[in-house]
Each structure stands twice: as structure tokens, then as C-alpha cells.
Amino acid sequence: MSRIGKQYISIPDKVNIRLEGQKVFVDGPKGKLTRILPSFICCTIDEPEKKVFLEKAEENKLSQALYGLSRTLLSNMVTGVSSGWHKKLTIAGVGYRAQLDGKDLILNMGYSHPVKMVTPPALSVSVESPTSITVSGLEKEAVGEFAAKIRSVRPPEPYKGKGIAYEGEVIRRKAGKTGKK
């Protein structure tokens, strides 16, 4: 039995959830999200208590695996439309910087050319300083995926720590060569 799947999802005041078959619609102050649940996952909404419960219709490995996943994805949708998701990245290194050109993100990361990244339409990117980037949006997966794409342009290296890292990420440092003396 999934410990995560058994838990209910509490619905905030300004968020509405409705079902049409296996399709779940979540509306909130930040926007709207839709997801199709697997056919063997049953969703029930308790309106007076403002809670959502998920149940398995079958007992097999696939339904067991997708039971907790479906609950977490639904919970992430509720959080996304109520408060949104954001991920911060920091840039370390001499001459490394970021800037916005319209909705496009331009990264100068020590290559012979600036790296231009087109922001997906569902996300917003802000550059607070040339060394700080924030990716925000409604869907947690989309925010994390685009932040990972930005980080992959120049991941932090272990010797000097130069590159793009998530805020709060711990970079394991290595000692350099000692050389002959």
C-alpha cells in the first residue's frame, strides 16, 4: 500500500477542482491546469471538507506504482495554481552572466558565443542580477526541466565551483594537483 497515495489532498480556499471522467481540472488564482489520471485510479472530491482522495481500482504493480505518483502530481497541480513554483539558479565565475532579451534568456558562459535559450510559453524567467536567475510557472515538472536545461549549459565544476548551480546546492569540491616541490 502506498503511504503517499493514502493521504488526502487539502484544497485551499481559492482553488476549484472538478472531474470529467478521468480528466481533472484545477483552477486557481494563478491559472488553470489539466491532467488525465490513469484508468485504474479513482478520484473522489469531498466538497464540504475541501479534500480530494485517490483510490486504486485494481491491485497490480502498475496501479501500485502510479497510485502515489498520481496523488503527488495532483498535489503539485493544486500548489501550482495557488502559489506557483519557482527555482533559483546562481552563476559563479569571472565573466559569466545572464540577461534577458524579451522572453529569451542569453547566457555568457565562457564559450566563443552567447547561449540563447527560448523560454517556454508556460514559464517566466527573471534575472534579478547578472548572476541570479529565477524560473517560475504553474507546473513543477516544466519549471524543473527548464531550470535543469539552464544548469546543463555550464554545470558547476568541482575545482573552483564555476558554473550554474541551483540556489542552496552543495558542490563537492576537490583539491587540485599538488605538483612536485
UniProtKB/Swiss-Prot annotation:
NCBIfam families for this protein: L6_bact
Gene3D superfamilies xrefs: Ribosomal protein L6, alpha-beta domain (3.90.930.12)
Annotated GO CC locations: chloroplast; cytosolic large ribosomal subunit
GO MF term list: rRNA binding; structural constituent of ribosome
Entry-linked Pfam families: Ribosomal_L6
SUPFAM superfamilies assigned: Ribosomal protein L6
Main location: plastid
BP-aspect Gene Ontology terms: cytoplasmic translation
Subunit annotation: Part of the 50S ribosomal subunit.
InterPro entries assigned: Ribosomal_uL6-like, Ribosomal_uL6-like_a/b-dom_sf, Ribosomal_uL6_a/b-dom, Ribosomal_uL6_bac-type, Ribosomal_uL6_CS
Subcellular location: Plastid, Chloroplast
PROSITE patterns linked: RIBOSOMAL_L6_1 (PS00525)
Transmembrane segments: none
Name by which UniProt lists this protein: Large ribosomal subunit protein uL6c
HAMAP family: Ribosomal_uL6_B (MF_01365_B)
Keyword entries, A-Z: Chloroplast, Plastid, Ribonucleoprotein, Ribosomal protein, RNA-binding, rRNA-binding
Family note: Belongs to the universal ribosomal protein uL6 family.
Reported function: Binds 23S rRNA.
UniProt key word Plastid: yes
